[in-house]
Amino acid sequence: MVKIYAPASIGNVSVGFDVLGAAVSPVDGSLLGDCVSVEAADLFSLRNEGRFVSKLPDNPKENIVYQCWELFCQEIGKTVPVAMTLEKNMPIGSGLGSSACSVVAGLMAMNEFCGKPLDDTRLLRLMGELEGRISGSVHYDNVAPCFLGGVQLMLEENGIISQPVPSFDDWLWVMAYPGIKVSTAEARAILPAQYRRQDCISHGRYLAGFIHACHTGQAELAAKLMKDVIAEPYRTKLLPGFAAARQAAEDIGALACGISGSGPTLFSVCNDMASAQRLADWLRDNYLQNDEGFVHICRLDKTGARQLG
């Protein structure tokens, strides 16, 4: 049997709409991500379990893990009968790369089980294709960090899909999921078709500056440049309490705060555990809206998807 864990990820990381992503894991060692296991069988089967299993489609063929199996078999040119189990620990429509977790874990599990017939680049292309079926367009800002780990910059040139960006080891990423759903398609539809020239210039400056600061080890500068002029101004209306949470993060001394992916999860960067804990407590008391919500203090997950056991 092969069992793969794929971690949560922050799409965009505020400053890099559709071109930047970061994988995260809780500092307490708990698994914030999905697991998929594969074992030999006479016929294909898929079983679902985990905290958020009730959110999955009733029809197995609509399940993204079934589609992983189907696409993988097409790619290698043969049908592989297996029993797959999806452990759905990630809320759907959370802004934590939930669909990417299932896609990455599903495809990587099949590839490992079959003796790695596909290299990482081919596997990543399939992951992007499947992610596109869910969100409406192929993009890698969740699947690339989830699969490869760390902070990834999407390039999609010269046969290179993404490359790693140096990160800051002392940064703590406070993740708060309020327990409500925002669909990626809805969050994309709310964005304007065209942007003002000044916003385009600002976006280029922030993103280029952030990448430069990461490569030159300037943590304070990098944090200051984590600004989103593309999506956040429009998406905040989908997120009750976001403005108050952002203000609280600033008051507590967070270095940066933004929307994780399409939301509603919020992320905030702190450089000491005391501030991170204070902010986590505030978010738990004020940003969560129901029992499904949660707050985790995380670090970057530099490993990405991996085999368990």
From Swiss-Prot:
Q: Which Gene3D superfamilies match?
A: 3.30.230.10, GHMP kinase, C-terminal domain (3.30.70.890)
Task: Report which reactions are catalysed by this protein.
Answer: L-homoserine + ATP = O-phospho-L-homoserine + ADP + H(+)
Q: Which GO terms describe its cellular component?
A: cytoplasm
EC main group: transferase
Annotated GO molecular function terms are:
ATP binding; homoserine kinase activity
Top-rank taxon: Bacteria
* Enzyme Commission no: 2.7.1.39
Q: Keywords assigned by UniProt?
A: Amino-acid biosynthesis, ATP-binding, Cytoplasm, Kinase, Nucleotide-binding, Threonine biosynthesis, Transferase
Q: Which InterPro entries match?
A: GHMP_kinase_C_dom, GHMP_kinase_C_sf, GHMP_kinase_N_dom, GHMP_knse_ATP-bd_CS, Homoserine_kinase, Ribosomal_Su5_D2-typ_SF, Ribsml_uS5_D2-typ_fold_subgr
Question: Its GO biological process terms?
Answer: threonine biosynthetic process
Carries keyword Kinase?
Answer: yes
Residue numbers binding ATP: 91-101
UniProt main location, coarse: cytoplasm
**Pathway(s) it belongs to:** Amino-acid biosynthesis; L-threonine biosynthesis; L-threonine from L-aspartate: step 4/5
Intracellular or extracellular location(s): Cytoplasm
Give one Pfam family.
GHMP_kinases_C
Role, per record: Catalyzes the ATP-dependent phosphorylation of L-homoserine to L-homoserine phosphate.
Looking up PANTHER family in the UniProt record yields: HOMOSERINE KINASE, HOMOSERINE/4-DIPHOSPHOCYTIDYL-2-C-METHYL-D-ERYTHRITOL KINASE
Q: What protein family is recorded?
A: Belongs to the GHMP kinase family. Homoserine kinase subfamily.
What is the protein's given name?
Homoserine kinase
Organism from which the protein derives: Pectobacterium atrosepticum (strain SCRI 1043 / ATCC BAA-672) (Erwinia carotovora subsp. atroseptica)
| Primary gene name | thrB
